[in-house]
């Protein structure tokens, strides 16, 4: 039963990362000044 909990936790983390990546892409498209430095790094990360 403990293994099942880890699987669920892993899925939740992956979903959160995907949502975060989507938010990042939207922010980068908007060219928000705060995100400009992070966006430069973000381009090297293959989402």
Swiss-Prot record:
The chain crosses the membrane at residues 6-26. GO terms for biological process: negative regulation of phosphorelay signal transduction system. Pfam families: MgrB (PF13998). GO terms for cellular component: plasma membrane. Residues 1-5 are cytoplasmic. The keyword Isomerase does not apply. It is found in: Cell inner membrane. The keyword Cell inner membrane applies. It is a single-pass membrane protein. May form homooligomers. Probably interacts with the periplasmic domain of PhoQ. Belongs to the MgrB family. PhoP-regulated transcription is redox-sensitive, being activated when the periplasm becomes more reducing. MgrB acts between DsbA/DsbB and PhoP/PhoQ in this pathway. Represses PhoP/PhoQ signaling, possibly by binding to the periplasmic domain of PhoQ, altering its activity and that of downstream effector PhoP. This is PhoP/PhoQ regulator MgrB.
């Amino acid at each position: 039963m403990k293994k099942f909990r880890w699987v669920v936790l892993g899925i939740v983390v992956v979903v959160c990362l995907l949502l975060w990546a989507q938010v990042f892409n939207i922010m980068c498209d908007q060219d928000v000044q705060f995100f400009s430095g992070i966006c430069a790094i973000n381009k090297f990360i293959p989402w």
